[in-house]
UniProtKB/Swiss-Prot annotation:
Lacks the C-terminal regulatory region which is replaced by HisZ. One of its GO terms (biological process) is L-histidine biosynthetic process. The lineage of its organism: Bacteria, Pseudomonadati, Pseudomonadota, Alphaproteobacteria, Hyphomicrobiales. The gene is hisG. It comes from Agrobacterium fabrum (strain C58 / ATCC 33970) (Agrobacterium tumefaciens (strain C58)). Keywords: Amino-acid biosynthesis, ATP-binding, Cytoplasm, Glycosyltransferase, Histidine biosynthesis, Nucleotide-binding, Transferase. This is ATP phosphoribosyltransferase. PANTHER family: ATP PHOSPHORIBOSYLTRANSFERASE (PTHR21403:SF8), ATP PHOSPHORIBOSYLTRANSFERASE ATP-PRTASE (PTHR21403).
Length: 230
């Protein structure tokens, strides 16, 4: 049995189902509207599991589902080596949002990651502590700051609430957060660095890289149908 995981609610659920229907894989409910299982009309070899977007990313990485629709940001944050663990079969054209580095607007001389690196280097001497970054994306933040930009002098503050409010509340100096329009960042007097986009995310159709998928005609057919539909 092939399992496709879809978002369990909201616009993402509707849009994901629409993509599958265009691909000739019409989703039908099993039981009542609150059921977390579905099926594909005319296909006894496929089942649908309804999960949250973050759960889908995790289950794809673990290989407990075969395909899933979820945000690229969640996959790359949730998995240690995303490209080795999953295949991004298709970008679906909805759920657009960027994971970005944002700093206070009053930091007039900080417009790039290089500028921020200079600030981080001087921060401890000036303030007696490391630059604090509030985020829910600790893996992406570490990769972007340390590996891509060579910035080491910072500490991550786990954000449990509205990340964009952390600098004003004194909980952090800057943030790494996801944004669709940037309006919430502007409302909190934050600006995105010119080269501070970590991931340009959108909903993706993702396949778990499982040995048993190699040469499986049904797996290849599903992936091909989705690619053709978008």
């Amino acid at each position: 049995m092939i399992t496709i995981a879809l978002p369990s609610k909201g616009r993402m659920k509707e849009d994901a189902s629409a993509v599958l229907e265009r691909a000739g894989l019409k989703v039908a409910s099993v039981g009542n509207d609150r059921s977390y299982r579905g099926r594909i009309e005319g296909r006894d070899d496929i089942e649908v599991a309804y999960l949250s977007a973050s759960e889908i990313a995790r289950e794809i990485g673990a290989g407990t589902v075969d395909f899933g629709v979820t945000g690229e940001d969640l996959v790359r944050e949730g998995l240690t080596n995303a490209d080795a663990q999953v295949e991004f079969c298709a970008r679906l054209g909805f759920g657009h949002a960027d994971v970005v580095v944002a700093v206070p607007e009053i930091w007039l001389d900080v417009d790039s990651m290089a500028d921020l690196g200079d600030v981080a280097s001087e921060f401890r001497a000036r303030h007696g502590r490391r630059l604090a970054i509030a985020t829910k994306y600790w893996r992406l933040t570490q990769q972007f700051f340390s590996r891509q930009h060579g910035i080491q002098l910072y500490r991550i503050v786990e954000s449990l609430g509205a990340t964009e409010g952390a600098p004003a509340a004194g909980q952090a100096d800057i943030i790494v957060d996801i944004t669709s329009t940037g309006s919430t960042l502007k409302a909190n007097h934050l600006k995105i660095l010119s080269d501070g986009i970590i991931v340009r995310s959108e909903a993706c159709f993702v396949r778990a890289r499982k040995p048993e998928h190699e040469g499986d005609a049904a797996i290849q057919e599903i992936a091909s149908r989705i690619k053709a539909a978008v």
